[in-house]
Amino acid sequence: MSADKKQNLQDTFLNAVRKSRTPLTVFLVNGVKLQGVVTWFDNFCILLRGDGRPPQLVYKHAISTIAPSAPVQLFDEEMGGD
């Protein structure tokens, strides 16, 4: 894969959970726990939607940990994760 086509792990992970609509638990650096599905992201923030509440725009620098509710396949089997 050429250098200009390489995606970083963060973008690969967020794109995979966005496409599969995998529910996430997001822990912020101040201890707040958010739950929802990623509907959009860019270099600085993530849009998180949850059941029955308006979407939340979360800045990435405020995130400590992201825990998906199910395993996430990041790479194709034939790629081998390289």
UniProtKB/Swiss-Prot annotation:
Record GO biological process: regulation of DNA-templated transcription; regulation of RNA stability; regulation of translation, ncRNA-mediated
Domain Sm residue range list: 11-72
GO cellular component: cytosol
Cross-referenced InterPro entries: Hfq, LSM_dom_sf, Sm
Listed Gene3D superfamilies: 2.30.30.100
GO molecular function: RNA binding
Assigned keywords, A-Z: RNA-binding, Stress response
Keyword DNA-binding: no
Quaternary structure annotation from Swiss-Prot or TrEMBL: Homohexamer.
Family: Belongs to the Hfq family.
Function per UniProt: RNA chaperone that binds small regulatory RNA (sRNAs) and mRNAs to facilitate mRNA translational regulation in response to envelope stress, environmental stress and changes in metabolite concentrations. Also binds with high specificity to tRNAs.
NCBIfam families for this protein: Hfq, PRK00395.1
UniProt protein name: RNA-binding protein Hfq
Organism: Hyphomonas neptunium (strain ATCC 15444)
